[in-house]
């Protein structure tokens, strides 16, 4: 046999081979989704040829009719799904069906192994392989206008064969033949196929035809009658018929007596999806079930949608739209390579393109749906769309309707909780990016607070609980609720009875940079300088006195720490902590610095000027600070002061959420303090080290005047 007959054999890419093995060797109850996936792929191929034909009409000369055809063959145990779409070249078959893994292949396998439903397969871009749920062999013949007809064949044994074929039926498009497994022949039944198409694919925008077997009555003569008929016909041909009277009528009666009726089987195509596009219908006439089915066919989701918005706009421009909020966020929602959104654009019921970036801002990329415009030209390109004023108006309306939809979701507390768990990052990204709708979006924010630790609260509810003398909204950003709740920064604010908002999502940092105020109340971080708490005259007086009293200590500490801090000041925010590190109002917070340091592709030049300018604030009421002041007042040149100040500073860095530049040095200071507390002298330590290593330890810095001041250290404790 020639190579053309044998074909070329290719190995499946490793991840695809693993996926197929998982599909074949694991039991799944809802195998019917294979048909939905194959029909969906056919629909995509038809979309592509129709879009191409808008600018190149000659592309349709190989077949003007666009449809999907399903043909079951019980005798051969095969099920064929054919479309007249764009087709695939030989290279497409090799790459798309085996040698190049889609980005979602690995993610889908991980999801499956974690217990996810097989019906999610379409969301990960690997729906074709679901064919192996019901087939032990799959043959794909495909004809692209730019290539000959090629056939892909595999029994999922780790490889596939590509060969050139001649298929007169396939002038353009793809024909997938599934060799159905012995225990899956139910999928060859017309009833079952109709049921699946109605359930999953009735809103596909192209005719789905099913080749059905039907019966009709046919009159046939018995054997004798057949012979007589032949003779009579022969005689009639030889002579002319002269009599047309009684004799003819008698002949006719005799003829009728000799005929019998039999059931004749024949095949014809039956269209399964005659429903007109759902978005063109009146919303009042559409049931929730119909919306759910359309959503599933549109999105490849296996769950119902969370909410829907169906509307039309008339006036200077006309368009209809149907928008859905899913139950859960897709696995790759914020991946850079992900298509921007899932909105399909139609012009006068003709599909133009999917994932139309210009229709929705990026923060609403989770919204799925269709937009059907009456005003855009049919042959519009992506480049023209970017300049289209019509599209800008449509986009503005869509965003407005999405916000209305979120309002409707918020009316049901449980539904909004589900929504917020999945899409809170999108809302916060919107606040960061969309200045026009920032105020409206802020109404959807929910946070845990010092007064509401079990249930999230809105900014509106926070404002309603504010004290009479409270003029600002207080918040703290951090890594976790536990960390911020026990932070030194919230001590006095909470002690005064003011509520503090806990922001623990990394994106909160970006969000709050843009959200400066809510309802006329300024948002203030309790970790930054300039925190003003309502105070009585007595408290103000005490604070001023403390500033004077500790002025000298602040100066000494600043001299010791030098460039490590911008300034040292008396604090009005601490209760039980001796000191803390606050940042300038316009620089990064400790949490933001942590986030930025974690960015693999960060701009290191930004770190220089945006990194927090650190201010050390001391608590004038804390015993450690009081004792330290006394020591400085007694002897400015006290050798232990420097080590104590550095240790206080480094500990404050850690408790304020910063990282240490030299953790080892800090650790050695702590160990040295422990030794002092245990009355271990330097000589004893050196002897112990020497007995083990034979060398004196020179890597750990000595505390200045440690031995002579060991007793005085205890006073500070």
Curated annotation (Swiss-Prot):
Keywords: ATP-binding, Chaperone, Cytoplasm, Nucleotide-binding, Stress response. A motif (TPR repeat-binding) lies at residues 713-717. Residues 240-251 have a biased composition (Acidic residues). SUPFAM superfamilies: ATPase domain of HSP90 chaperone/DNA topoisomerase II/histidine kinase, HSP90 C-terminal domain, Ribosomal protein S5 domain 2-like. It is found in: Cytoplasm. GO terms for molecular function: ATP binding; ATP hydrolysis activity; ATP-dependent protein folding chaperone; unfolded protein binding. This is Heat shock protein 90. It comes from Brugia pahangi (Filarial nematode worm).
């Amino acid at each position: 046999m020639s190579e053309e007959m044998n074909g070329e054999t290719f190995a499946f890419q490793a991840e695809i081979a693993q996926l197929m093995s998982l599909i074949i060797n694991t039991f799944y109850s809802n195998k019917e989704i294979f048909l939905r996936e194959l029909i969906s792929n056919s629909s995509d191929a038809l979309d592509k040829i129709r879009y191409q034909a808008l600018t190149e009409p000659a592309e349709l000369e190989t077949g003007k009719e666009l449809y999907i055809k399903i043909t079951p063959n019980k005798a051969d145990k095969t099920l064929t799904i054919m479309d007249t779409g764009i087709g695939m070249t030989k290279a497409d078959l090799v790459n798309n069906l085996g040698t190049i893994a889609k980005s979602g292949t690995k993610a889908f396998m991980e999801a499956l192994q974690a217990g996810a439903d097989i019906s999610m397969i379409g969301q990960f871009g690997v729906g074709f392989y679901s064919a192996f749920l019901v087939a032990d062999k799959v043959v794909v013949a495909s004809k692209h206008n730019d290539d000959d007809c090629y056939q892909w064949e595999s029994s999922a044994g780790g490889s596939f064969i590509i060969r050139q074929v001649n298929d007169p039926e396939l002038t353009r498009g793809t024909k997938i033949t599934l060799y159905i497994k012995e225990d899956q022949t139910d999928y060859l039944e017309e009833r079952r196929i109709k049921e699946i198409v109605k359930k999953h694919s009735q809103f596909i925008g192209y005719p789905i035809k099913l080749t059905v077997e039907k019966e009709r009555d046919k009159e046939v003569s018995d054997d004798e009658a057949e012979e007589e008929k032949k003779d009579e016909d022969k005689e009639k041909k030889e002579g002319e018929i002269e009599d047309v009277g009684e004799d003819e009528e008698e002949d006719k009666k005799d003829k009728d007596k000799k005929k019998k009726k039999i059931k004749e089987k024949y095949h014809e195509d039956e269209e399964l999806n005659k429903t007109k596009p759902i978005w063109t219908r009146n919303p009042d006439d559409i049931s929730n079930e119909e919306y759910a089915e359309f959503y599933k066919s549109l999105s490849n989701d296996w769950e119902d949608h969370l909410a829907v918005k169906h509307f039309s706009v008339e006036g200077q421009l006309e368009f209809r739209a149907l928008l859905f909020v899913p139950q859960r966020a897709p696995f790759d929602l914020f991946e850079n390579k992900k298509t921007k959104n899932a909105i399909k654009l139609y012009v006068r019921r003709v599909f133009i393109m999917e994932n139309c970036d210009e229709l929705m801002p990026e923060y609403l990329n989770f919204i799925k749906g269709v937009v059907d415009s009456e005003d855009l030209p049919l042959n519009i390109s992506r480049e023209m769309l970017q300049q289209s004023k019509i599209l800008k108006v449509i986009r503005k309306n869509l965003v407005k309707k999405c916000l209305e939809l979120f309002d409707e979701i918020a009316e049901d507390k449980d539904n909004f909780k589900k929504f917020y768990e999945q899409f809170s990052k999108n809302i916060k990204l919107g606040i960061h990016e969309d200045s026009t709708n920032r105020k409206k979006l802020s109404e959807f924010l929910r946070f845990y607070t010092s007064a509401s630790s079990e249930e999230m609260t809105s900014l509106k509810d926070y404002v309603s609980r504010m004290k009479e003398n409270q003029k600002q909204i207080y918040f703290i950003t951090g890594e976790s609720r536990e960390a911020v709740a026990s932070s030194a920064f919230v001590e006095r604010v909470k002690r005064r009875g003011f509520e503090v908002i806990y922001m623990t999502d990394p994106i909160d940092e970006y969000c709050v940079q843009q959200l400066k105020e809510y309802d006329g109340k300024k948002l203030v971080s309790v970790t930054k300088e300039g925190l003003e708490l309502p105070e009585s005259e007595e408290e103000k007086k005490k604070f001023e006195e403390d500033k004077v009293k500790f002025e000298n200590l602040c100066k000494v500490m600043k001299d010791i720490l030098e460039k490590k801090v911008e300034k040292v000041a008396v604090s009005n925010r601490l209760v039980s902590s001796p000191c803390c590190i606050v940042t300038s109002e316009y620089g990064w917070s400790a949490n933001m610095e942590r986030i930025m340091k974690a960015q693999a592709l960060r701009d290191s030049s930004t770190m220089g000027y945006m990194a927090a300018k650190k201010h050390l604030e001391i608590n004038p009421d804390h015993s450690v600070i009081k004792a330290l002041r006394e020591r400085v007042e007694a002897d400015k040149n006290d050798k232990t002061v420097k080590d104590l100040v550095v240790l206080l500073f480094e500990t404050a860095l850690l408790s304020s959420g910063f990282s240490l530049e030299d953790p080892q040095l800090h650790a050695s200071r702590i160990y040295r303090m422990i030794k002092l507390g245990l009355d271990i002298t330097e000589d004893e330590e050196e002897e112990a080290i020497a007995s083990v290593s034979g060398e004196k330890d020179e890597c750990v810095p000595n505390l200045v005047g440690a031995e002579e001041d060991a007793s005085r250290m205890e006073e500070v404790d």
